[in-house]
Swiss-Prot record:
Swiss-Prot/TrEMBL keywords: Antibiotic, Antimicrobial, Immunity, Innate immunity, Secreted, Signal
Family to which the UniProt record says this protein belongs: Belongs to the cecropin family.
Induction: By bacterial infection.
The protein's name: Cecropin-C type 1
GO terms for cellular component: extracellular space
GO biological process: antibacterial humoral response; defense response to Gram-negative bacterium; defense response to Gram-positive bacterium; innate immune response
Coiled coil: none
Signal peptide span: 1-23
UniProt keyword Signal, yes or no: yes
InterPro entries tied to this protein: Cecropin, Cecropin_insect
Location(s), subcellular: Secreted
Job description of the protein: Cecropins have lytic and antibacterial activity against several Gram-positive and Gram-negative bacteria.
Length: 59
């Protein structure tokens, strides 16, 4: 039982230390996700007033 907890902690520490060298790829992925999030937010920002107006007309 304790072995699994210790193993998980060691594995997490190893991933954090090794993951530092892979920051370039992760940064690119993060930028892509951020851009997609911005596009979704902007589209929702434009569409929500239209949807709210259509609901008000339907009442």
């Amino acid at each position: 039982m304790n072995f699994t907890k210790i193993f998980v902690l060691i594995a997490m520490a190893a991933l954090l230390l090794v993951g530092q060298s892979e920051a370039g790829g992760l940064k690119k992925l993060g930028k892509k996700l951020e851009g997609a999030g911005k596009r979704v937010f902007n589209a929702a920002e434009k569409a929500l007033p239209v949807v709210a107006g259509a609901k008000a007309l339907g009442k």
